[in-house]
Every structure is written in structure tokens, then in C-alpha cells.
């Protein structure tokens, strides 16, 4: 994680996502641009709320941990996506864990600055309301809904989300992947073998490579995590 002191890039993101119409100049002075590497955590469930993050480049993975210690994936997010908005409104600790799937760029502003300079700003409040409403509107695609799908669909969707680009390859820990999509190591291993036999993916030296992205899309029907 590092702060990017690039005023040109900062302005480009503000214009691209029409954030100049949301944040007034005094508030913009409290916004900073940050870069996170692939696999880096933006926040963890239970962390003390501190910032509102706005994803302006890259992809995020959002997952949660149950009381029993099991970790399940909830969804993947693309720009423009807010992290920490619900926590700001509810004044609660972070409710989910958020990880960078690719290199990501995020705008960041402290909750204190929001409270001090935008507590009653209708533009900011409308922006937050729209984002939170959309999250609740799409809640039908939550964990319980995902688990209704066969493991084949869940795995195909997961691979499409974490392996970006055609013929992309990555080293995936099958135990972690199985936990995230809510199945066993043995089951996910069998499904991966089936995908290999169908020529959809290749597994070699611990890495999985997508060979037939369209074939995986057919199995996924639609990507249930995005």
C-alpha cells in the first residue's frame, strides 16, 4: 500500500467518475489516492472504521467470516464502488474483509473529515444513499443465494473472477478456494479435474490456467459473484 502523489491521475479519476459533482473543494482537499498490490487487504472484518474508500481502478474481492471461523466469498466489485459507507452511516466496525484481486487504486477520505465537512451535505448524502441502496437491492445475490448453486457453477464463476484476462494463470490454494465458495477440498479437486478433462482449464505445478473462458462462462451461466 502506498499513497500516490499524482495530481493529474487524481483529477482524472475525479472527472471519470463525476466525483467533482459530489465532493466540494474543501472536502476534496481531504481526499487522497492510494495504490494496493494484488492480494493486499484493504480492510478486515472487525477493524475499527476509519475511512471511506472509493474503488476507481481494478477489482476487489469481498468476503466474510462466520462465527465458526469459516470464510465465504460474497462478491467481486469493480469501479465505482464504495467501501466503508455502511460503516460510516451506522458508526460500526468494518463488516467484511476486502482484498485486492488486481492492483487497485482507491480514493480515501477519513470518516472524521466526512463528519466535519459533509455531515449535512445533500450531494454527499445522496451519493452515499444511492450506493447503500444498491448494495441492499443486490443482496439477493448474497452468501445463502450463492450456496444454492452447484459447486461447478460456483467454481467456474470464482475462476472467471480471480483469473483475469484470457489464458491467465495463477497459483490458487485449493483449501482456501474451497472454503471461499463453500465446499470441501475433495469436492473442488474433483471439479477441477473435470474442468481439466473438458479442456476448460489446465493445472500444472500448482497453477491453474484458463484455456476456454467461453466454456467456463457457459457453465457459470452468468458470473454469480459479479
Model-derived regions: residue spans:
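Cyclic-nucleotide recognition modules
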Residues: 23, 73-130, 137
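Polybasic "coupling" helices that flank or enter modular domains
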Residues: 101, 119-185
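Phosphate-/nucleic-acid-contacting segments
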Residues: 151, 160-226
Amino acid at each position: 500500500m502506498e499513497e500516490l502523489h499524482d495530481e493529474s491521475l487524481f483529477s482524472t479519476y475525479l472527472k471519470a467518475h463525476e466525483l467533482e459533482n459530489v465532493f466540494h473543494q474543501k472536502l476534496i482537499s481531504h481526499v487522497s489516492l492510494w495504490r494496493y498490490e494484488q492480494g493486499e487487504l484493504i480492510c478486515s472484518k472487525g477493524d475499527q472504521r476509519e475511512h471511506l474508500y472509493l474503488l476507481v481502478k481494478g477489482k476487489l474481492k469481498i468476503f466474510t467470516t462466520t462465527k465458526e471461523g469459516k470464510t465465504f466469498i460474497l462478491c467481486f466489485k469493480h469501479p465505482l464502488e464504495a467501501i466503508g459507507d455502511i460503516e460510516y452511516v451506522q458508526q460500526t466496525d468494518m463488516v467484511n474483509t476486502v482484498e485486492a484481486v488486481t492492483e487497485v487504486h482507491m480514493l480515501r477520505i477519513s470518516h472524521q473529515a466526512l463528519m466535519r465537512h459533509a455531515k449535512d451535505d445533500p450531494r454527499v448524502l445522496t451519493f452515499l444513499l444511492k450506493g447503500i441502496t444498491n448494495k441492499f437491492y443486490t443482496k439477493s445475490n448474497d452468501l445463502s443465494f450463492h450456496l444454492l448453486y452447484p459447486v461447478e457453477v460456483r467454481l467456474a464463476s470464482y475462476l472467471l473472477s480471480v483469473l483475469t484476462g484470457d489464458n491467465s494463470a495463477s497459483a490458487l490454494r485449493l483449501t482456501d478456494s474451497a472454503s471461499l465458495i463453500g465446499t470441501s477440498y475433495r469436492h473442488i479437486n474433483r471439479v477441477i479435474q473435470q474442468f481439466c478433462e473438458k479442456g476448460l482449464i489446465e493445472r500444472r505445478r500448482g497453477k491453474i490456467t484458463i484455456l476456454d473462458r467461453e466454456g467456463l462462462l457457459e457453465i457459470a451461466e452468468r458470473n454469480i459473484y459479479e
